[in-house]
């Protein structure tokens, strides 16, 4: 009974972190284009389309047709990320494109949750380019393109056995599925996109899992993993910055 109570308490703590970290960590207002407030929604989300090629909203988003590797330098040490465009082409393409544009250079990890147990490190808010912007106030920003519009990418989840990902719809606990059979899972070291309660609200903010986080599978888009430097990730603290980010392999796969 004591063991079961501990398990229940652990799960409750993780769910609380999910509500206060990832969902509020991406956008509080989603800029002026949306007034949606963040929070865990129990209502099922409706997919815009399971075939992204038919959706004009995402026609011009970059795609990664294959694999790539990205090197982050944090606290003077490298973190090598594998970026999976095979199973998450749009999410991966967005990240690689932003790396090549220099968006992540100098940005802070504004949320780091290690207690009461390891959870995630989260960064990628472009507002952090301003050295006077308080780190504690980060978490609402996304990438603004040359036209002044915020780039949003669809929720992209590929299930085992499917030839294409499903878009714009959570397939995990947010849709009532406890253990979805997804290709890219929230294992320790997984690289994924933060978003608000709206499924297609991810932009530039990402997180790295500090532990296996199965309860996030199917609801947040994993698009890569840490290949080398997980010890560096484990030692990231709030306010630490990405000194540089560059594509070291597979840049030719960005379309």
What are these regions (language model features)?
Residues 2-13:
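Bacterial N-terminal signal peptides that target proteins for export
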């Amino acid at each position: 009974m004591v063991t079961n109570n501990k398990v229940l308490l652990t799960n409750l703590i993780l769910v609380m972190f999910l509500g206060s970290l990832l969902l509020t960590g991406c956008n509080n207002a989603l800029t002026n284009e949306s007034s949606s407030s963040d929070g865990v929604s129990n209502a099922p989300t409706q997919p815009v389309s399971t075939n992204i090629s038919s959706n004009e909203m995402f026609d011009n988003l970059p795609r990664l047709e294959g694999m790539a590797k990205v090197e982050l330098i944090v606290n003077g040490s490298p973190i090598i990320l594998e970026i999976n465009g095979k199973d998450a082409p749009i999410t991966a393409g967005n990240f690689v494109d932003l790396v090549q544009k220099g968006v992540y250079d100098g940005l802070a990890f504004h949320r780091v949750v290690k207690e009461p147990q390891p959870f995630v490190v989260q960064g990628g808010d472009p507002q952090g380019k301003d050295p006077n912007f308080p780190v504690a106030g980060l978490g609402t920003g996304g990438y603004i393109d040359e036209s002044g519009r915020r780039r949003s990418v669809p929720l992209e989840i590929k299930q085992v056995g499917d030839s294409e990902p499903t878009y714009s719809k959570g397939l995990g606990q947010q849709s009532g599925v406890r253990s979805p059979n997804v290709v890219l899972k929230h294992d320790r070291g997984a690289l994924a996109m933060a978003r608000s309660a709206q499924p297609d609200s991810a932009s530039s903010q990402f997180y790295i899992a500090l532990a296996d986080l199965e309860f996030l599978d199917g609801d947040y888009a994993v698009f890569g993993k840490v290949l080398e430097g997980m010890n560096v990730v484990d030692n990231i603290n709030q306010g630490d910055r990405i000194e540089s980010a560059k594509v070291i392999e597979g840049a030719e796969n960005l379309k």
